[in-house]
């Protein structure tokens, strides 16, 4: 229930420092060489800063106002800054919501800053700042406890005590399964807290009153939920203030614990009622701690009189007093002075009981005493002294105690931070294990003449792990002298602001217009140096340590600093030996290195040699090796040059010392090989990917969040950077040492001579090792680039083409607010999931019982991450991650650094380098890389995965599959030239595989066509071995060239063995698409003309014309139809007469097209295809007719646009009707003559128009002129202006005179039309018809009951026969004995007489009848006379 930062309960003592694999002999890791004895080997630790390069942490500020506090006191009390931390009870359990979660805080004056951290998830709203009005927070006066539902924070100031209630994380989320990458902190809803609630705060009473100069305090929760605060009394002793449970009303009470008696004061209105004793203040507590047992609490007080007192709160009595000076060897001076600086810590183990750690401070020395609390049956207590540990460091800032270890934090005489730890049970020699602290950035930046000061300073300021964002922001604010600036800046924005600020200061100081380059450079360096010094000052201030935070559940140790949090991680054995001070190597336990003492001594001597070399290497020498790695030069030659320089400047005989140490090594070659093998992370088997599918889903999902926060990622990667940096130096010094060995030859070796070849082999093994660590170090410092969303989406599309989007290396990119290094990006996006799944794939114990041990976990994770980053290992997830997250520049640089010396994953690297070149627009370089990678297909895991198809089916050789993927990628990106080049290269690989050949040649064809390389496209098409693909490509060629109007190329290609196919394709297209927007018929016509196939050309154009008439009802369509028929006619005229014919396309036929739906009848059944169609042959004459008809259609459409819709497909007979309706009588007559049709419709139509004009108004007259003008009228001289009616009658007259036929059919039909409409016949028409057929005219009169006109006609006709006006009736010879016979239409005359006689009552009719009878009488007499004369003449 209760866990205090001062005395954290410890878990069972399992592992306090992780066991390391010991050095083994030369050869593979694990081969030969006996490991060191099993057990927990004590190692040094390394400090890693947890200050990410994010924006300064955003604190939400709240003011805590307490009624009754005095203003004067706040200003009078000055407390030092302090810090502390709290770990959740289940923070070490694998499936707890509070796993890897903790709270830490910092106090300064009236301010308390609280932060909640998690190594698994990113917590939101996790930082608050509380300001206590008129109060100062007691150093260490913050205590955090947790219950099942709540987290309770107890806070003490110099005037008040406070209780803050927050929800427990287990009650904040719906499920215990945490799967989100971001979650709310317990501080999220703190804005709802009422800090003035009297139930949760109270003033410290003036009596007994807090000791004015004391900072000791402790607080805890009772089993009943009461909040208790223990403080030193002003008069000595302790008083305890109790707040009732937050949910139960109650009184506040104060209990004063005194040596002589126990007095309790119930506080009512805070009036003092207790009696002061004469107690001396020498028993005033310097440090307080509490340990809860069931329903009691033991309060331990380390007092000024150097005594430890133990109080029972329940019994309110002192249970034990122990004089600590009894355990101090030199105590005379201490007994005479009051104690200062003593500190007390508790540690509880369920198995071992309660441990007390006491630090006794004395001038220039200090001592730790470890005790175990022992109780007897009679409830008496005593201390069992476990250990005393001495230290020479003067100023102890803080220490932490577990049931096995002490961790201590000092400031030494040079104000440097020192952290050490020791196992107080087993360490007989009292040897403290060091923690290698993170050094501050270099005080001075050395800039060579060839370097730009600004670039070098910016590089130093913004290199990951150097300066925190907060230090840079504060320096910027000071440097700009209070200028208003927005300091909520991202890393890149801050870099711009810094550059701008320094450059502005530089410009502002310039007073002259002209500078020499050297003067400007010096001035520039001065200002940058000034800003750098300012940053260094703030970084140093923020790095000031305040406290240690130790979690016994996970054995995680943190260092709480003024500006940030740092973590301590264990060193590997090699790093530990190399980083140890030289003097510590003298006392290093050899058994921790190897069970073989000789091997262990050789290794220690070797390390001593390396340390001597490291101390002799100057900054310039170090740069030589760095630059040789960066410039891809030989590390061996660089080491040789450094050795030469060391020998040259060796004034302290260091080389002699090294040679002396080498003499002590029994087997240098073996020792060096051992060291190399220990540092080599090369493996032959790639790490498994993904979680064990046998594990339940909830377990797998829970594990996916383990160490998933930005903080954890940053720490892990800083750990990798630290290892890589240290190992790089070790390898560098090893190379130098090996060069020295080469110089010395066999002289240095005792016993038998060593082979020169063995030395060479070691040299060639060390160089790749050094380059590997350099590459990892470089990646740990190289910042990732923030990528726009559209670039990520485009990249994802490209990767989907390669079917790589399901790869573990290519997850959705989610950049954090701060820039990451590419190694951080890799860990967070890819590696963490692989490592965690690997760690928990085969657990030794059930996962539910698995506890998290920080040293073990961080060691394993960094080790596996190094394995994944190791350049010579088979997998290349790191490169895939960079490629998947668009880190192309970084990927390019990485491969460039890797390429010359690493021959693993060469093909994969070339492929990814090709992807980089594609992005940067260097297509030819990309193509070269892709071709180079092809040779490695089948040899590398990444390339094998690249070519693996989704269905697992292998359709061609691996290399061809690779080419196929790359071709698809180039196609999606839109690089047809590269596609052609690569496909051409791949054809050679295809060999006799005709399917692959067809695919590749089709690809070449397609992209040549896209580029407009028509000839090359045709050539590629002719080489496609698959006829089906070839036909598809041919169809595409036709369509594309038509769309581009590149018809000449299309027509002129030879089409060897493809002639019928191309004709079929064009015909099919012609019949399938719109006639007016595509010109496939004209293309086909040109195609046949180019090949002199005129009959087919004519057939094509005739079909085109037919369809135009049927489908295109526009004037343009009719024009094209005429031209088509004319072209078809010309084609046939070019052929010999016997071959000048074509087969007429079936009118209205639907041509079969691919994909066309079958035709169905009304019942839905498919109609049977027509069979045995009759073939119609069209000859030249038929075409001429069609051509004439097409011209006439166009004429009609031009004259009458409304006729366009019906004219196109109309027959000749229908066209005559349309022309007559439109008034185009000349055209109609021409059409009738061409097609040998009667003119009857023309005359009837013209007669009808005359009738309409006769009775129409002016509108009809005006309209008539339009169609009259379209007919050729013979010019007639007239004395008066003719009307449209007159002109129409004249046109009719002209036609009747011009177009005469047998039986005078046209006169008959005209007169019949007129009479049928009751129109009187014009005289000219009557006279005209009398001349040709008077008898028929008579019959027409009778048909329409025109009796009077009939009588007149008969009278005139009889007179004409008898010789009077015979020329008007076309009678050449009238009646005479010498003339030919004449006749009268007696039948018609009889009908007339009968009709007149039918109405005998009508006198007019009787008169008319008599008139005819008289005429006939006269006629008959003259006939009789003429007959007699004729007979007479014959007799003569």
Swiss-Prot record:
GO biological process, one term: nucleocytoplasmic transport
Compartments it resides in: Nucleus, Nuclear pore complex
InterPro entries listed in its UniProt record: Nucleoporin_Nup160 (IPR021717), NUP160_helical (IPR056547), TPR_NUP160_C (IPR056536), TPR_NUP160_M (IPR056535)
Keywords: Disease variant, mRNA transport, Nuclear pore complex, Nucleus, Phosphoprotein, Protein transport, Translocation, Transport
First-listed, main subcellular location of the protein, grouped into a coarse class: nucleus
Residues with PTM Phosphoserine: 44, 490, 949, 1157
Cellular component aspect of the GO annotation: cytosol; nuclear envelope; nuclear pore; nuclear pore outer ring
GO MF term (any one): structural constituent of nuclear pore
Disease: Nephrotic syndrome 19: A form of nephrotic syndrome, a renal disease clinically characterized by severe proteinuria, resulting in complications such as hypoalbuminemia, hyperlipidemia and edema. Kidney biopsies show non-specific histologic changes such as focal segmental glomerulosclerosis and diffuse mesangial proliferation. Some affected individuals have an inherited steroid-resistant form that progresses to end-stage renal failure. NPHS19 is an autosomal recessive, steroid-resistant form with onset in the first or second decade of life, resulting in chronic kidney disease.
Biological role stated in the UniProt entry: Functions as a component of the nuclear pore complex (NPC). Involved in poly(A)+ RNA transport.
Subunit structure comment from the entry: Part of the nuclear pore complex (NPC). Forms part of the NUP160 subcomplex in the nuclear pore which is composed of NUP160, NUP133, NUP107 and NUP96. This complex plays a role in RNA export and in tethering NUP98 and NUP153 to the nucleus.
Protein's name according to its UniProt entry: Nuclear pore complex protein Nup160
Organism of provenance: Homo sapiens
């Amino acid at each position: 229930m209760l866990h205090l930062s001062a005395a954290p309960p410890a878990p069972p003592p399992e592992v306090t420092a992780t066991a390391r694999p010991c050095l083994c002999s030369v050869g593979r890791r694990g081969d030969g060489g006996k490991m060191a004895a099993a057990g927990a080997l004590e190692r040094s630790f390394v400090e890693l800063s947890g200050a990410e390069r994010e924006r300064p942490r955003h604190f939400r500020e709240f003011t805590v106002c307490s009624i009754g506090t005095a203003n004067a006191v706040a200003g009078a009390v000055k407390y030092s800054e302090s810090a502390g931390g709290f770990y959740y009870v289940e923070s070490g359990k694998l499936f707890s919501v509070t796993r890897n979660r903790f709270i830490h805080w910092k106090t300064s004056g009236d301010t308390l800053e609280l932060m909640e951290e998690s190594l698994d998830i990113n917590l939101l709203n996790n930082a608050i700042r509380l300001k206590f009005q008129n109060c100062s927070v007691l150093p260490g006066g913050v205590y955090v406890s947790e219950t099942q539902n709540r987290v309770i924070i107890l806070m003490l100031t110099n005037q008040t005590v406070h209780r803050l209630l927050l929800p427990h994380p287990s009650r904040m989320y719906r499920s215990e399964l945490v799967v989100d990458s971001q979650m709310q902190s317990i501080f999220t809803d703190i804005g709802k807290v009422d800090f003035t609630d009297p139930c949760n705060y109270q003033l410290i009473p003036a009596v007994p009153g807090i000791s004015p100069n004391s900072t000791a305090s402790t607080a805890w929760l009772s089993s009943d939920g009461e909040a208790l605060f223990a403080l030193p009394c002003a008069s000595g002793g302790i008083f305890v203030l109790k707040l009732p449970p937050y949910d139960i009303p109650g009184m506040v009470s104060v209990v004063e614990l005194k040596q002589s008696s126990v007095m309790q004061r119930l506080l009512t209105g805070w009036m003092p009622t207790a009696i002061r004793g004469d107690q001396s203040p020498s028993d005033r507590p310097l440090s307080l701690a509490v340990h809860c047992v069931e329903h009691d609490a033991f309060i331990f007080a380390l007092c000024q009189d150097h005594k430890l007192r133990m109080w029972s709160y329940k019994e309110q009595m002192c249970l034990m007093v122990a004089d600590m000076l009894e355990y101090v060897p030199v105590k005379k001076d201490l007994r005479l002075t009051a104690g200062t600086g003593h500190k007390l810590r508790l540690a509880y183990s369920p198995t071992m009981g309660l441990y007390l750690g006491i630090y006794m401070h004395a001038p220039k020395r200090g001592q730790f005493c470890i005790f175990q609390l022992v109780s007897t049956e009679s409830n008496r207590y005593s201390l069992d002294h476990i250990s005393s540990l001495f230290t020479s460091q003067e100023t102890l800032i803080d220490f932490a105690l577990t049931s096995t270890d002490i961790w201590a934090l000092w400031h030494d005489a040079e104000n440097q931070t020192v952290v050490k730890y020791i196992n107080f049970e087993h360490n007989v020699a009292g040897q403290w294990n060091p923690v290698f602290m993170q050094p501050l950035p270099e005080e001075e930046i050395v800039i060579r003449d060839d370097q730009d000061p600004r670039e070098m300073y910016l590089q130093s300021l913004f290199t990951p792990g150097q300066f925190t964002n907060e230090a840079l922001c504060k320096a910027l604010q000071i440097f700009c002298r209070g200028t208003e600036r927005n300091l909520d800046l991202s890393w890149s924005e801050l870099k711009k602001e810094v550059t701008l600020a320094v450059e502005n200061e530089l410009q502002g100081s310039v007073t002259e217009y002209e500078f020499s380059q050297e003067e400007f450079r010096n001035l520039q360096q001065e200002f940058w140096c000034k800003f750098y010094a300012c940053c260094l000052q703030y970084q140093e201030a923020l790095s000031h340590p305040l406290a240690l935070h130790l979690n016994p559940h996970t054995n995680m140790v943190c260092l709480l600093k003024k500006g940030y949090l740092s973590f301590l991680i264990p060193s590997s054995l090699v790093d530990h030996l190399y980083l140890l001070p030289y003097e510590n190597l003298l006392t290093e336990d050899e058994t921790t290195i190897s069970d073989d003492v000789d091997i262990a001594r050789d290794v220690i001597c070797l390390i001593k040699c390396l340390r001597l070399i490291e101390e002799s290497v100057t900054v310039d020498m170090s740069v030589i090796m760095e630059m040789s790695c960066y410039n891809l030069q030989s590390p061996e030659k660089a080491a040789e040059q450094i050795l030469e320089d060391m020998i040259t400047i060796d004034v302290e005989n260091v080389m002699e010392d090294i040679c002396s140490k080498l003499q002590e090594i029994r087997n240098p070659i073996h020792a060096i090989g051992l060291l190399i093998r220990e540092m080599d992370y090369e493996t032959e088997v790639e790490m498994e990917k993904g979680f064990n599918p046998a594990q339940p889903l909830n377990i797998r999902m829970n594990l996916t969040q383990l160490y998933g926060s930005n903080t954890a990622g940053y720490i892990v990667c800083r750990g990798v950077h630290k290892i890589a940096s240290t190992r790089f130096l070790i390898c560098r010094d090893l190379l130098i040492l090996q060069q020295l060995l080469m110089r010395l030859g066999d002289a240095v070796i005792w016993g038998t001579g060593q082979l020169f070849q063995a030395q060479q082999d070691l040299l060639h093994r060390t160089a790749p090792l050094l380059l590997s660590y350099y590459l990892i170090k470089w990646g740990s410092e190289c910042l990732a680039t923030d990528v726009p969303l559209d670039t990520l989406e485009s990249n994802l599309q490209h990767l989907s083409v390669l079917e790589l989007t399901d790869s573990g290396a290519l997850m959705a990119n989610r950049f954090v607010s701060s820039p990451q290094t590419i190694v951080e990006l890799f860990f967070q996006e890819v590696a963490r999931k692989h490592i965690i799944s690997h760690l928990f794939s085969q657990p030794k114990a059930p996962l539910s019982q698995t506890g998290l041990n920080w040293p073990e976990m961080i060691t394993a994770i960094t080790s596996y991450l190094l394995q994944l980053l190791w350049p010579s290992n088979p997998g290349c997830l790191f490169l895939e991650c960079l490629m998947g997250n668009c880190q192309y520049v970084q990927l390019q640089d990485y491969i460039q650094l890797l390429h010359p010396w690493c021959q693993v994953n060469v093909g994969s690297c070339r492929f990814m380098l090709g992807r980089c070149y594609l992005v940067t627009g260097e297509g030819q370089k990309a193509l070269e890389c892709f071709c180079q990678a092809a040779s490695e297909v089948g040899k590398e895991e990444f390339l094998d995965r690249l070519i693996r198809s989704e269905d697992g089916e292998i359709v061609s050789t691996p290399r061809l599959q690779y080419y196929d993927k790359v071709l698809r990628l180039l196609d999606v990106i839109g690089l047809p030239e590269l596609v052609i080049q690569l496909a051409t290269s791949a054809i050679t690989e295809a060999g006799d595989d005709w399917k692959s050949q067809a695919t590749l040649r089709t690809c070449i064809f397609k992209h040549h066509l896209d580029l407009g390389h028509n000839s090359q496209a045709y050539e590629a098409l002719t080489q496609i071995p698959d006829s089906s693909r070839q036909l598809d490509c041919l169809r595409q060629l036709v369509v594309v060239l038509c769309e581009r109007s590149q018809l000449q190329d299309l027509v002129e290609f030879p089409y060897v063995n493809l002639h019928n196919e191309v004709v079929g394709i064009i015909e099919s297209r012609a019949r399938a698409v719109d006639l007016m927007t595509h010109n496939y018929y004209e293309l086909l016509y040109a195609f046949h003309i180019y090949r002199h196939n005129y009959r087919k050309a004519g057939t094509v154009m005739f079909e085109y014309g037919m369809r135009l008439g049927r489908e295109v009802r526009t004037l343009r369509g009719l024009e094209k139809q005429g031209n088509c028929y004319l072209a078809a006619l010309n084609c046939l005229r070019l052929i010999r007469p016997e071959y000048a014919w074509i087969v007429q396309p079936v009118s209205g036929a639907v041509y079969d097209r691919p994909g066309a739906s079958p035709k169905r009848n009304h019942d839905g059944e498919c109609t049977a295809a027509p069979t045995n169609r009759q073939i119609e042959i069209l000859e030249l004459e038929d075409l001429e007719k069609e051509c004439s008809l097409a011209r006439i259609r166009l004429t009609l459409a031009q004259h009458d646009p409304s006729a366009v819709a019906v004219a196109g497909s109309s027959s000749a007979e229908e066209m005559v009707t349309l022309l007559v309706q439109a008034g185009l009588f000349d055209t109609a007559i021409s059409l009738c003559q061409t097609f040998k049709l009667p003119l009857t419709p023309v005359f009837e139509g013209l007669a009808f128009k005359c009738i309409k004009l006769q009775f129409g108004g002016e509108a009809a007259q005006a309209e008539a002129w339009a169609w009259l003008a379209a007919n050729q009228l013979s010019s007639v001289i007239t004395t008066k202006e003719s009307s449209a009616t007159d002109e129409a009658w004249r046109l009719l007259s002209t036609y009747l005179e011009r177009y005469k036929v047998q039986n005078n059919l046209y006169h008959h039909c005209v007169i019949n039309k007129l009479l049928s409409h009751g129109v009187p016949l014009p005289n000219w028409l009557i006279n005209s018809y009398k001349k040709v057929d008077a008898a028929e005219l008579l019959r027409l009169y009778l048909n329409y009951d025109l009796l009077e006109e009939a009588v007149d006609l008969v009278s005139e006709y009889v007179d004409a026969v008898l010789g009077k006006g015979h020329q008007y009736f076309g009678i050449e010879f009238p009646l005479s004995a010498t003339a030919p016979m004449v006749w009268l239409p007696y039948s018609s005359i009889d009908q007339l007489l009968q009709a007149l006689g039918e109405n005998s009552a009508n006198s007019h009719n009787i008169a008319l009848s008599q008139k005819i009878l008289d005429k006939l009488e006269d006629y008959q007499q003259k006939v009789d006379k003429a007959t007699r004369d004729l007979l007479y003449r014959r007799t003569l």
